[in-house]
Every structure is written in structure tokens, then in C-alpha cells.
Regions:
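A charged, amphipathic alpha-helical module
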Residues: 1-2, 35
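Short, small-residue-biased leader/transition segments that mark boundaries at the very start
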Residues: 3-4, 165-166
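Acidic catalytic cores of enzymes that act on phosphate-bearing nucleotides/polynucleotides
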Residues: 6-20
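Segments forming glycine/polar-rich beta-alpha architectures that bind adenosine-containing cofactors
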Residues: 19-52, 56-61, 65-68
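Ferredoxin-type iron-sulfur electron-transfer modules in oxidoreductases and energy-metabolism complexes
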Residues: 33-52, 78-110, 139-151, 156, ...
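Iron-sulfur cluster-binding cysteine motifs and their immediate structural context
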Residues: 39-41, 65-84, 103, 113, ...
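Secondary-structure capping and boundary motifs in well-ordered enzyme cores
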Residues: 52, 59-62, 104, 109, ...
């Protein structure tokens, strides 16, 4: 919407670039109450972490604990159809999904958003695998994972969990 574009392009990007002091007071006339439109944090890809988690497809037990504990939702599990997996980027490694019934037809991937990650390492600490499925690596070595994150966000929401819940 126009509200998002105006706020993100005219205010948020300048503030994030440390140029907020160049903004005229008139830039804030639509926000006199100090509010910001909901959802604009999706545009704040700051890349502030020194180190970010790297997922090891060969060590993951698919427990999703890393995703549960991430305070910034920067690491998330994804299920893919065979077709989606075939169309994934070459660096997009997947596993056969663990589980019963309908889940078995999917592929699994744990994906990190390197630009949203704050580098706290809580995900690594929470990993219960005997050999940790996540290790911290320098952000600059993982920037290519942003393409994988962007691909993950295009995946269909194909799984119905209603019959799997208690």
C-alpha cells in the first residue's frame, strides 16, 4: 500500500542508514502520535549479527527446537512438495520429512534468515542433537542464504495439521 511505501522509503530506510537527522519534520506529519504501520519490520534487513547459525542437513533430527526458541523468528522449518524441492536453488538442501501419515510425502528444511538473525546463538544452545545441527559462522560467509530464505517464503502452505493435533 502507499502508506507502507511512503513510511519505508521516506522514513525507515533513512533512519536505518543513520540518516534520520536529515529528515524534515514534515516527513513525520502522518505519524504525529509516534505510530508506525504494522508489518514494516519485514523491511528491516539489517544484517547486524557477527555470526549466524548454519544448518547441517546431516545432523538435524527435525525437532524444530531451534525455531521455537528464536526470539526474532530468523530460523524457521519449511515443508516442501517434491515439485518445490526440484525447483529449489542448488544450495537448498532438504531431508525427507520425519513424521507419520501425510507428512512423509514432504521434504524438510530448516532455513536461517541471515539478515534478520541477531546472532544470539540461542538456537544452537537449544539443539538437542548429539552432534549439533547448527554451528555459528561469520555472517559474511552466509549472505548467500538470503536467496534460500527468499525462496522459502514462496513455498505453498500445503499441510493441514488439524487432524494431527490433540
Amino acid at each position: 500500500s502507499d502508506v507502507y511505501k511512503r513510511q519505508v522509503n521516506n522514513i525507515q530506510k533513512k533512519i536505518n542508514a543513520q540518516m534520520g537527522n536529515t529528515l524534515p519534520v514534515s516527513a513525520f506529519k502522518d505519524y504525529v502520535d509516534g505510530s508506525t504501520p504494522s508489518g514494516t519490520s519485514a523491511y528491516e534487513k539489517r544484517g547486524v549479527a557477527v555470526d549466524v547459525p548454519v544448518w547441517d542437513v546431516n545432523k538435524c533430527i527435525q525437532c524444530n527446537q531451534c525455531s521455537y526458541v528464536c526470539p526474532h523468528a530468523a530460523i524457521r522449518p519449511f515443508l516442501l512438495t517434491e515439485e518445490e524441492a526440484a525447483n529449489a536453488p542448488a544450495s537448498y538442501a532438504v531431508l525427507d520429512a520425519n513424521g507419520a501419515g501425510e507428512i512423509k510425502q514432504y521434504k524438510f528444511r530448516m532455513q536461517v534468515d541471515p539478515l534478520d538473525c541477531q546472532g544470539c546463538g540461542v538456537c544452537v544452545t537449544a539443539c538437542p542433537a548429539k552432534e549439533k545441527a547448527l554451528v555459528m559462522q561469520p555472517l559474511e560467509t552466509q549472505l548467500h542464504e538470503q536467496d534460500n530464505w527468499d525462496f522459502s517464503l514462496t513455498l505453498s502452505d500445503t499441510v493441514s495439521y488439524t487432524h494431527l493435533t490433540l
